[in-house]
């Protein structure tokens, strides 16, 4: 063969080359001639985003699946795109304007939106370039954006349809309000943080009764200015005699009643709660039951309004301090306690969220949730691992109406229109400029935009052309599998199922593959504040993208988190180098005239035992790989191909076949060996390709002009796993491995050659040793090996059992027995001490309850390794003691 590969594997050069060639040749476009289809939609990253470790894991998993199905001949569509990310993008652009001492309100709405589009076109979408660097085999010609015209058409159609059915409505309710960004956010965007706060016990004077009070506990004293009642549990005997009591609301001139409702917890505080319907969700519901009118005391920007009296204009937290000071001055604070409680924060900006009474748009979610629940219960949608179904059902059964309006400028404008002249109101899929009731042109569109997740929930079918009945929609919907982290099951997965069942009468995907998070090696979540964030681009540049991808897949346990250990990346870089160097060895021993024809019947009839063995080992690898793939066990797939390539192929077969490859045997034997070497390498590259696309494509290009990305998925060889040749090589491998272990356990230096005696009367042992004596001497570093069933074992001999008998290594003269025994005893002492420490650690309930499960598992693995090591050391000492 004329083609060769370089002396060293240079990842960056290879990666840049193939990114360009794949795109130029449109290698990732769906095959329109294929009968079967396989489709995945990428969870659309934010247009503001850059590739983080979670993206890298999620996209690597998807790419592995897509590349496998493409090689299996299916028409694969992996559809990319980005989310307009309403609040996140608007905040980014506002920060850019702030650098010029400008703010959003300095512009008209249209001018500001124009600036956001400018930013999107110039600076947004950085993540697309980074996805290409990761080697993602998506069809970039189909890239979509949630504000595309087609997707917007789908959004407005869904809104109108749900509105017409009464499933979208406008109403006044308590919502999560962010005073910093001055917009509503959904329940799912509220991040509750455990906060060390205070519980204030405030005296509410009984009206007309001097020095008589009821004590109410609260964590938010500034909201008491909006109290309209105090409430007790009707079964609380402390207060049943006070049914007609009226209270003076402290710091105001208002009186409020004492009422009774079963939602009050008798055990919390004094058993009394203040009812503030405009600033608490539970109070709002209680207020509706009790017929109370809400009183809003806060402005949208978090300052107190005119209903707060003398506190008007103060920031909410300043108002809290002033209210407390005034209560203290009036002697109305009974006590203040330290109190740890969950405080809601905006998951994007971090501002403390206010429960706030506001008129917003909502989705009546229960009827839609029922559709999603039925889809999962009936098996139309399967969660993998199955444990996530329970989480899904729990959330769906406790779901509340979804607030979908946002007080932003960037996003899908709510398609509702209001006539200023006749007050007519209508919802329309297309813009309304003339009132359909009175003909007036004084029509105003609703000022709010939709929650970003409203458009994202339509992603699986809107990106395929819906509401138009396109060929893509017919062919690729439902999609085959959704790959996602557990953190967006509620944000996104559940809503997509609802919308798919509602508008497509079919779920958007058949399987939902849930993977864990990537954490640091101590099990902590990556966080900028902690300073442990890993940049995947840095890792890819340092170790090569293939090493990084393989690491993510190989360390991903089913449904659990990955603990990021950079040292393993170094190991997988070595794996890449091993493949490269082994490939170079094979190519250097192929003549220019060599043509890889595979294992044809003509080659098959002249296969030698070592050839039969490596073909059977490939079959075993393929079987394990396919079995793991069917269960989405990526770590098992990676382990199968890693062990085959590094162990069976490189460390065993290549070493065994070298004399034949060098031409030291008959020409026919050499020819067969070279066909086996090249064909097994090509098939192994085919299995490895989904994990390591760049390296495999580069090596494969030497053998074929067809890109490996589109070559057929490897098949098994027609060789029996129990043939005599395979049995002999399995036995040879066992003997060599046993001798290597014996040498190591007894401290025999690598450069010292031993004599080996095999005590076995088995014919297979005899023929294996006789036929492979040269290989045995070379691989086990032996001076000689012989079969002697009558050999009498000496005191200084090391003995090990194998399936057909015993192997004996005479150690006399090879090692200093006393010195080696002392070394092993010191090592044993050290290992037993480490083992004892780990056992104490793993029996500590505090560690077991606080540490991440992955960290506990890692420590258990360490203990198991130490237990095995201790046994080996004891055996070695015992051997030396005779």
UniProtKB/Swiss-Prot annotation:
One of its GO terms (molecular function) is ATP binding. It comes from the Bacteria. Signal peptide: none annotated. A motif ('HIGH' region) lies at residues 45-55. A motif ('KMSKS' region) lies at residues 525-529. One of its GO terms (cellular component) is cytosol. It catalyses: tRNA(Val) + L-valine + ATP = L-valyl-tRNA(Val) + AMP + diphosphate. Residues 812-881 form a coiled coil. Keywords: Aminoacyl-tRNA synthetase, ATP-binding, Coiled coil, Cytoplasm, Ligase, Nucleotide-binding, Protein biosynthesis. Pfam families: Anticodon_1 (PF08264), tRNA-synt_1 (PF00133), Val_tRNA-synt_C (PF10458). It is found in: Cytoplasm. ValRS has two distinct active sites: one for aminoacylation and one for editing. The misactivated threonine is translocated from the active site to the editing site. Monomer. Catalyzes the attachment of valine to tRNA(Val). As ValRS can inadvertently accommodate and process structurally similar amino acids such as threonine, to avoid such errors, it has a 'posttransfer' editing activity that hydrolyzes mischarged Thr-tRNA(Val) in a tRNA-dependent manner. This is Valine--tRNA ligase. It comes from Leptospira interrogans serogroup Icterohaemorrhagiae serovar Lai (strain 56601). The gene is valS.
């Amino acid at each position: 063969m004329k083609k060769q590969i370089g002396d060293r594997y240079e990842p960056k050069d290879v990666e840049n080359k193939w990114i360009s060639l794949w795109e130029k040749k449109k290698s990732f476009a769906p095959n329109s001639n294929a009968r079967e289809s396989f489709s995945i939609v990428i969870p659309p990253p934010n247009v503001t985003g850059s590739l983080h470790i979670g993206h890298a894991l999620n996209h690597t998993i998807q790419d592995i699946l897509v590349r496998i199905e493409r090689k299996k001949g299916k028409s694969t569509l992996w559809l990319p795109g980005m989310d307009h990310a309403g609040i996140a993008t608007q905040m980014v652009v506002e920060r850019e304007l702030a650098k010029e001492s400008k703010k959003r309100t300095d512009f008209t709405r249209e001018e500001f939106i124009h600036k956001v589009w400018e930013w999107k076109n110039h600076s947004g979408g950085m993540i697309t370039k980074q996805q290409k660097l990761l080697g993602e085999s998506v069809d970039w010609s189909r890239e979509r954006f949630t504000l595309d015209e087609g997707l917007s058409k789908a959004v407005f159609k869904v809104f109108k349809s749900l509105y017409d059915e009464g499933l979208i409505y406008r109403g006044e309710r308590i919502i999560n309000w962010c005073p910093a960004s001055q917009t509503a956010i959904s329940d799912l965007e509220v991040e509750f943080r455990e906060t060390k706060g205070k519980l204030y016990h405030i005296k509410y004077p009984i009206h007309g009764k001097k020095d008589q009070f009821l004590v109410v506990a609260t964590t938010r004293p500034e909201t008491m200015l909006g109290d309209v009642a105090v409430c007790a549990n009707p079964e609380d005997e402390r207060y049943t005699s006070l049914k007609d009591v009226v209270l003076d609301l402290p710091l105001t001139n208002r009186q409020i009643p004492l009422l009774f409702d079963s939602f009050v917890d008798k055990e919390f505080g004094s058993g009394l709660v203040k009812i503030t319907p405009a600033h608490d969700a539970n109070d709002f519901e209680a207020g509706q039951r009790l017929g109370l009118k809400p009183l809003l005391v806060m402005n949208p920007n978090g300052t107190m309004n005119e209903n707060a009296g003398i506190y008007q204009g103060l920031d909410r937290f300043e108002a809290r301090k002033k209210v407390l000071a005034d209560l203290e001055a009036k002697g109305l604070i009974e006590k203040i306690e330290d109190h740890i409680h969950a405080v809601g924060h905006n998951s994007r900006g971090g501002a403390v969220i206010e429960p706030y009474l506001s008129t917003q748009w909502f989705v009546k979610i229960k009827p839609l949730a029922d559709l999603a629940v039925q889809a999962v219960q009936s098996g139309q949608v399967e969660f993998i691992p199955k444990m996530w179904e329970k989480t899904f059902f729990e959330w769906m059964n406790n779901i509340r109406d979804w607030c979908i309006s946002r007080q932003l400028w960037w996003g899908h404008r709510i398609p509702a229109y209001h006539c200023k002249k006749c007050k007519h109101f209508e919802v329309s899929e297309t813009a309304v400029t003339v009132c359909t009731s009175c003909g007036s042109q004084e029509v105003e569109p609703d000022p709010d935009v939709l929650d970003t997740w409203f458009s994202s929930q339509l992603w699986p079918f809107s990106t395929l052309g819906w509401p138009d009945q396109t060929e893509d929609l017919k062919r690729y919907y439902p999609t085959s599998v959704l790959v996602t982290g557990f953190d967006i099951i509620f944000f996104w997965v559940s809503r997509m199922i609802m919308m798919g069942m509602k508008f497509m009468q079919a779920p958007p995907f058949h399987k939902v593959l849930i993977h864990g998070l990537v954490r640091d090696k101590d099990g902590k979540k990556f966080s900028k504040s902690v300073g442990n964030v890993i940049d995947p681009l840095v890792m890819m540049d340092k170790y090569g993208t293939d090493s990084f991808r393989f690491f993510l897949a190989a360390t991903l346990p089913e449904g659990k988190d990955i603990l990021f250990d950079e040292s393993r990346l170094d190991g997988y870089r070595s794996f890449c180098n091993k493949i490269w160097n082994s490939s170079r060895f094979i190519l250097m021993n192929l003549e220019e005239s060599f043509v890889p024809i595979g294992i044809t019947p003509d080659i098959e009839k002249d296969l030698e035992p070592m050839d039969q063995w490596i073909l059977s080992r490939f079959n075993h690898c393929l079987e394990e790989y396919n079995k793991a793939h069917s269960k989405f066990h990526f770590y098992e797939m990676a382990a199968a191909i890693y062990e085959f390539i590094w162990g069976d192929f490189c460390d065993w077969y290549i070493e065994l076949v070298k004399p034949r490859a060098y031409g030291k045997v008959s020409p026919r034997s050499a020819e067969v060996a070279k066909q086996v070497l090249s064909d097994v390498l090509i098939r192994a590259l085919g299995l490895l390709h989904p994990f390591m696309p760049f390296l495999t494509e580069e090596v494969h290009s030497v053998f074929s002009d067809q890109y490996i990305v589109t070559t057929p998925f490897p098949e098994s060889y027609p060789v029996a796993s129990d043939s005599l040749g395979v049995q002999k090589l399995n036995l040879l491998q066992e003997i060599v491995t046993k001798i290597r272990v014996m040498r190591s356990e007894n401290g025999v230096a690598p450069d010292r050659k031993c004599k080996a005696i095999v005590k076995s009367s088995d014919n297979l042992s005899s023929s294996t040793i006789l036929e492979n004596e040269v290989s045995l001497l070379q691989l086990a570093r032996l001076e000689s090996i012989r079969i002697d069933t009558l050999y009498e074992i000496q005191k200084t001999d090391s003995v090990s059992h194998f399936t057909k008998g015993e192997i004996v290594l005479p150690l006399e003269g090879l090692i200093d027995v006393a010195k080696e025994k002392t070394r092993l005893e010191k090592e044993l002492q050290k290992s037993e001490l480490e083992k004892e420490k780990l056992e104490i650690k793993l029996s500590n309930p505090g560690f077991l309850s606080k540490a991440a499960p992955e960290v506990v598992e890692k420590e258990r693995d360490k203990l198991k390794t130490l237990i095995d090591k201790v046994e080996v050391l004891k055996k070695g000492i015992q051997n030396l003691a005779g």
